[in-house]
Amino acid sequence: MAEEFSNTTHESFNFTLHTTLGVTTKLVLPTPAEPILPVQTGEQAQQEEQSSGMTIFFSLLVLAICIILVHLLIRYRLHFLPESVAVVSLGILMGAVIKVIEFKKLANWKEEEMFRPNMFFLLLLPPIIFESGYSLHKGNFFQNIGSITLFAVFGTAISAFVVGGGIYFLGQADVISKLNMTDSFAFGSLISAVDPVATIAIFNALHVDPVLNMLVFGESILNDAVSIVLTNTAEGLTRKHMSDVSGWQTFSQALGYFLKMFFGSAALGTLTGLISALVLKHIDLRKTPSLEFGMMIIFAYLPYGLAEGISLSGIMAILFSGIVMSHYTHHNLSPVTQILMQQTLRTVAFLCETCVFAFLGLSIFSFPHKFEISFVIWCIVLVLFGRAVNIFPLSYLLNFFRDHKITPKMMFIMWFSGLRGAIPYALSLHLGLEPMEKRQLIGTTTIIIVLFTILLLGGSTMPLIRLVDIEDARARRRSKKDVNLSKTEKMGNAIESEHLSELTEEEYEAHYIRQQDLKGFMWLDAKYLNPFFTRRLTQEDLHHGRIQMKSLTNKWYEEVRQGPSGSEDDEQELF
């Protein structure tokens, strides 16, 4: 009845407009849009909610077990074992136990233990990438920015072309399974993402050359973003079905797409970071740390969503945003928010990394595999060869322009430290290859390569460093049991806040410029950019910051000392 009345009213209104205006063309109002309804309703929605709840429970359970494992590694000083290796091994063990439980038909957690690529790229990867940029040692990074960029951009592209081209031509020769050119390049791009978590932990423990440490660490940070952009480029070419386009046109379009993604995303992230610095410089939120911290969290995730929304790389944008916010915005924060931001990012990044490595181990039993021994062996050979073609020629080229030369021993360690990690694994699951057997072959091969590099190469890095005698003299005098490979323990002990310094910004700037022979961007940054984007701290600001920290610490300490009966230990004070 209501529908008939609505239709009658609609038609009469059209007729009224028609007669009133005296036009010859009938005026028709647009049909009302259909209401937006939930995708799942009723019993189906309830089942979806239950499934999501079990997935969350299972993920948190895995994380809790991994945290206990890391705690045991720290407590019993098993510092020779990197946390990533231990977590992957635990994931493999848990996957085997779940497989036995499913075989005995005691429970079915098949859906919960499956890794979802969208969850990785939307929830897990952004905090990891942002934290790596935010905690970056800016001095060593910018002093070696040319070398790092060459290895991360051109080196990754070389490795991707070597692996992708090798797979394509071996397939054409019927040595391994055939893949077309774009699929081969996509696999070469995703498998070129290095993640030397275990190697960096060993470098820090043995105090190797800081230049070597920064070259490997800096390359790995930019390399992740470059690898994702290259993989997206190959996928974009696949979606366009460019089989009738010449090779040169394909290459030129791929290059244009890559340059747009790389520089556009980097510019967006840099601009967002600079805007955040200006906002928090001119809007003083230091007296309300909760609002200040909330604004930082918003600006941290903002470039990722914007970049993905305009078809750029969110990972590249959030990386550069993290670097810029750490360099400028961080110094506009109150001391409480500075420390809170560092510890929160480290905690969230640790949880995300642990979750990814655990599910990487679980995937051995949960992922539908297609194993081809010749394909796996040739891919491992090509990965190692592509890394060598990347590192050694570029290192020799850079030595013509560097004062601090990259020695052959350092080149060898850089080649050996090309571990693969979570990003190749997630990218392999994200590829939309057809048929399904091809996707399973790529996924299985990627998992094997990742485990091979983490367990074998990562586990043998410390003996190799001792063998080639590249460690610092202090570390050489230590016994093996004193070497600490715990990233969690090291990062938990690091607290940085310039508010705890005794120098004002002007005094520190004058002292820094006087002590350092700054050139190029470093001089420009210290002279003009840093004063423009950061708040100038006076002695009064420093004094107020120290008082605030002491007051809050005493307050927290008193609350911690509060006994169950409500009594306090007033005799002891922290300060």
Curated annotation (Swiss-Prot):
Tell me which UniProt keywords the record has, alphabetically.
Antiport, Cell membrane, Cytoplasmic vesicle, Differentiation, Endosome, Golgi apparatus, Ion transport, Membrane, Phosphoprotein, Sodium, Sodium transport, Spermatogenesis, Transmembrane, Transmembrane helix, Transport
> Where Phosphoserine occurs along the chain?
S565, S567
Q: Which InterPro entries match?
A: Cation/H_exchanger_CPA1 (IPR018422), Cation/H_exchanger_TM (IPR006153), NaH_exchanger (IPR004709)
Membrane-spanning ranges: 54-74, 78-98, 117-137, 150-170, 185-205, 255-275, 305-325, 348-368, 373-393, 411-431, 445-465
Expression by tissue: Intestine and kidneys.
What's the chief localization of this chain?
Golgi
- Reaction(s) catalysed (UniProt annotation): Na(+)(in) + H(+)(out) = Na(+)(out) + H(+)(in)
Q: How is its activity regulated?
A: Expression and activity are regulated by acid media by increasing the rate of trafficking to the apical membrane. Inhibited by HOE694 and S3226.
Tell me, which GO biological process terms does this entry list? acrosome assembly; potassium ion transmembrane transport; proton transmembrane transport; regulation of Golgi lumen acidification; regulation of intracellular pH; sodium ion transmembrane transport
An annotated GO cellular component: trans-Golgi network membrane
Tell where it localizes.
Golgi apparatus membrane; Golgi apparatus, trans-Golgi network membrane; Endosome, Multivesicular body membrane; Apical cell membrane
Q: Which residues carry this modification: Phosphothreonine?
A: T504
Q: State the membrane topology.
A: Multi-pass membrane protein
The terms under GO molecular function for this entry are: potassium:proton antiporter activity; sodium:proton antiporter activity
What does the similarity note say?
Answer: Belongs to the monovalent cation:proton antiporter 1 (CPA1) transporter (TC 2.A.36) family.
Matching PANTHER family, A to Z?
SODIUM/HYDROGEN EXCHANGER, SODIUM_HYDROGEN EXCHANGER 8
- Physiological role: Na(+)/H(+) antiporter. Mediates the electoneutral exchange of intracellular H(+) ions for extracellular Na(+) in 1:1 stoichiometry. Acts as an Na(+)/H(+) exchanger in the trans-Golgi. Contributes to the regulation of pH regulation of Golgi apparatus, and consequently, in protein trafficking and endosomal morphology. In germ cells, plays a crucial role in acrosome biogenesis and sperm development, probably by playing a role in the fusion of the Golgi-derived vesicles that form the acrosomal cap. Can also be active at the cell surface of specialized cells.
Q: Which NCBIfam families match?
A: b_cpa1 (TIGR00840)
Put simply, this protein is called Sodium/hydrogen exchanger 8
Q: What is the lineage of its organism?
A: Eukaryota, Metazoa, Chordata, Craniata, Vertebrata
- Tell me the gene name: Slc9a8
